Design a protein with these regions (language model features):
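Short N-terminal or domain-adjacent regulatory/targeting segments
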Residues: 1-20, 143-156, 212
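N-terminal basic/disordered segments at the start of proteins
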Residues: 2-45
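Gly/Ser/Thr-rich loops at beta-strand to alpha-helix junctions
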Residues: 28-36, 58-59, 87-97, 117-118, ...
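A short beta-strand-loop structural module common to alpha/beta enzyme folds
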Residues: 48-66, 197-200
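Glycine-rich, highly charged phosphate/nucleotide-binding loops
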Residues: 62-76
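Long, charge-dense
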Residues: 95-149
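A conserved mid-domain beta-alpha-beta active-site/ligand-binding segment of alpha/beta enzyme cores
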Residues: 130-185
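C-terminal, charge/polar-rich interaction regions
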Residues: 173-224
Length: 224
């Protein structure tokens, strides 16, 4: 777990007409899968927040992620008078409303997205527009590292695990995907999945998702 902030003397950021002093920042609690992209947005000054990242490995176990996320929200809610924004998807804790229960429990704001990939695409279910039947394996640099663990399985077993999918869709948000080509080829070979397409998505979708959540957080605070 790690927390970072990018203080900028005298700097102000405006999101949809809402102005915030740099020393009064909300805290975002995010999956580590989005760390590189969020840090880049912070460095550019597109968003102005404190950022706390949980390990992407927690995705392997709903219970571990639930405990870690509960602990992080509880801690940072007390320490962040400007509010907390959770950057996890609706289904990251399960498919029975578990994430909504956590958000309601602490009365904080969450990004409008199904999962991390949906965040990168712009949220609001855009993932389902691209993959309505859940037939694609989406890979960006963070997910390439995450999926690489399948190499511990035999090729036969791995291909059986992924046999319900049609293929791989590559997502390049940072313009660095070419550096991972050998790893992409290894994953394609091990899973038996063809590479169907590559989308150079940039960071605009993620930035929009974050600004919309920051806007809702500010409105929530102004109404309280």
């Amino acid at each position: 777990m790690a927390e970072i902030t990018y203080p900028k003397a005298g700097h102000k950021v405006v999101a949809k007409g809402l102005e915030m002093q740099s020393d009064e920042k909300p805290c975002v609690i995010s999956c580590g899968i989005l760390r590189k992209e969020i840090e880049h947005l912070l460095e550019k000054g597109d968003i102005d927040v404190k950022a706390h990242f949980l390990s992407e490995r927690l995705h392997n176990d709903y219970n571990l992620l639930d405990r870690a996320l509960n602990g992080a929200v509880k801690k940072h809610r007390k320490q962040s008078p400007e509010g907390v924004i959770v950057i996890y998807g609706d289904v990251c804790l399960g498919f029975n409303g578990e994430m909504k229960k956590l958000i309601d429990k602490y009365d904080v704001v969450k990004v409008d997205a199904l999962n991390c990939i949906d965040c990168l695409l712009g949220g609001k279910g855009k993932l389902l527009e691209m993959d309505p039947d859940h037939k694609f394996l989406f890979l960006n640099p963070a997910f390439i590292k995450f999926v690489e663990k399948i190499k511990g399985q035999t090729k036969e077993k791995t291909r059986e695990m992924f046999s319900m999918l049609d293929g791989i869709v590559l997502l390049d948000a940072m313009g660095d995907l070419d550096a991972y080509q050998s790893k992409i080829d290894e994953i394609a070979d091990h899973t038996g999945l063809p590479i169907l397409k590559r989308k150079n998505i940039g960071l605009g979708g993620l930035n929009d998702v974050l600004l919309e959540a920051l806007d809702r957080n500010q409105q929530k605070r102004s109404e309280s």
